[in-house]
């Protein structure tokens, strides 16, 4: 059933109809459309368009339809309706007859779809927040179990300074906490209802829009009808949040892909999140992580597409805005799936501590400690930096780590070096000295774990 047509003397070309129709993707707004329609029916009672009995009939029919949709949402796609609004109205008329045609009084699909989409976004943000916190908890648990797993930290993919696997996990907890904060901020801006703004100029009926917003679970009603039906900031904001969140997950995936290589060998992934090769029987591929990394580009593309769609649109509603949903649905679905998959990866991960320790002892990751030692002996840092660089060259020439050089060898580069240097060069000393807030010392890592656990409790 079309919601328009009186103005037209010819039927739409079937090719145009297929091009124009949006039911194949906006069917996902069915529950929100029905909930919004129930609230609108109540508002129409307050202005005398519907009687209380009529409203009750409509609400009962809409509630029945809501249950049918929850049981079998795919039934919607069997229809040739233009969009979800047409489908809901058609089904309502099937149930209550002519009374169903009164429901759209004073309402436009412009404020209707804006309301539906905001309701859907609120529901989806709640799911994303839950998945985000579940992943944070998984990272904190993994950190707690690996506080003593020493491994190399990297800059430029070169071994830099020793860290722990726990400290690495907690870095991603911080990123996910920022993602959580962004979603919570977005939820605040989402919490205003556009229903009752009509096509663009507001409704002609003196409906209490604040009361209507409350019925729908919004904190308040929007203040400008023209903006309300044109606004898709919430779509851009959530796509931006998803893009940033997926960048974090992509980096998480890339780190673990590297840690899982034969060359690094720091972790082993569970069989549950890996796959094999059709040709090479020895292969165990990190497909879950590679897909997380790959899907990041898909989400970034949705943000870029939506920015380009909106940038040249005049106020108020334009059909271009129908393009807001597919990218948003796909991006948030993808982000949600990747959050769940990242948690599953952690669930079965094995940290190979001996190999991590071995790698941390290689690559002269304790060179900074030697420089700090020289500074403590009164050598200016820039001079100490140069001395240690020369010392590393000598250690490489001899094929030894710094701590295996003889005292005589070390004193060739600085006479202030004494026997007390050797304890300083141990991995444990490297960790213990990083005791300022946010550092990798065991005490700081333990405090960070306790803080994260309390925040997530």
UniProtKB/Swiss-Prot annotation:
Its EC number is 4.3.2.1. GO terms for molecular function: argininosuccinate lyase activity. GO terms for biological process: arginine biosynthetic process via ornithine; L-arginine biosynthetic process. Keywords: Amino-acid biosynthesis, Arginine biosynthesis, Cytoplasm, Lyase. Gene3D superfamilies: Fumarase/aspartase (C-terminal domain), Fumarase/aspartase (Central domain), Fumarase/aspartase (N-terminal domain). InterPro entries: Arg_succ_lyase_C, Argininosuccinate_lyase, Fumarase/histidase_N, Fumarate_lyase_CS, Fumarate_lyase_fam, Fumarate_lyase_N, L-Aspartase-like. One of its GO terms (cellular component) is cytosol. The keyword Ligase does not apply. It catalyses: 2-(N(omega)-L-arginino)succinate = fumarate + L-arginine. The keyword Cytoplasm applies. Disulfide bonds: none annotated. It is found in: Cytoplasm. It comes from the Bacteria. Pathway: Amino-acid biosynthesis; L-arginine biosynthesis; L-arginine from L-ornithine and carbamoyl phosphate: step 3/3. Coiled coil: none annotated. Its main location: cytoplasm. Belongs to the lyase 1 family. Argininosuccinate lyase subfamily. This is Argininosuccinate lyase. The gene is argH.
